Regions:
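C-terminal structural segments of small proteins and small subunits
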Residues: 74-94
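Short S/T/G/P-rich N-terminal loop/turn motif that feeds into the first structured element of a domain
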Residues: 1-64, 68, 72-79, 106-108
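Charge-dense polyanion-binding interfaces
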Residues: 92-108
Length: 108
């Protein structure tokens, strides 16, 4: 089995919202920035709304907000998952989540 312990890990989350208004999308982006940015071991953080103007056949618009976080390694990701700020983000925002999809991958 491959040792991935020192590889960067991309944590990508797609949120579908019950209230999919522009205001609700913006509120989730602001909450994500407040609670999820600046964690130890974070290499990259971004959050934003779906780009509806991208209309190629391969573009997937089945989400409202996308979160992208790259961690130095899996250990940093694991600490983030149980950090009080991450848990507060979930608790304060989950009522408006219709569906959440998480894609975690090791980077080459």
């Amino acid at each position: 089995m491959t040792d991935n312990s020192n590889r960067q890990l991309a944590h990508i989350v797609f949120f579908d919202l019950n209230d999919d208004s522009a205001e609700a999308r913006q509120a989730l982006c602001e909450a994500a920035t407040k609670y999820l940015s600046g964690h130890d071991g974070t290499v990259y953080f971004s959050v934003g709304i779906v780009g509806d103007e991208f209309t190629r056949p391969v573009n997937d618009h089945n989400y409202s907000v996308a979160l992208h976080v790259v961690f130095e390694n899996k250990a940093a990701h694991d600490v983030y998952q149980t950090h009080e700020r991450h848990l507060a983000f979930i608790e304060e925002n989950k009522a408006n989540w219709k569906r959440v999809r998480v894609f975690d991958s090791y980077l080459a």
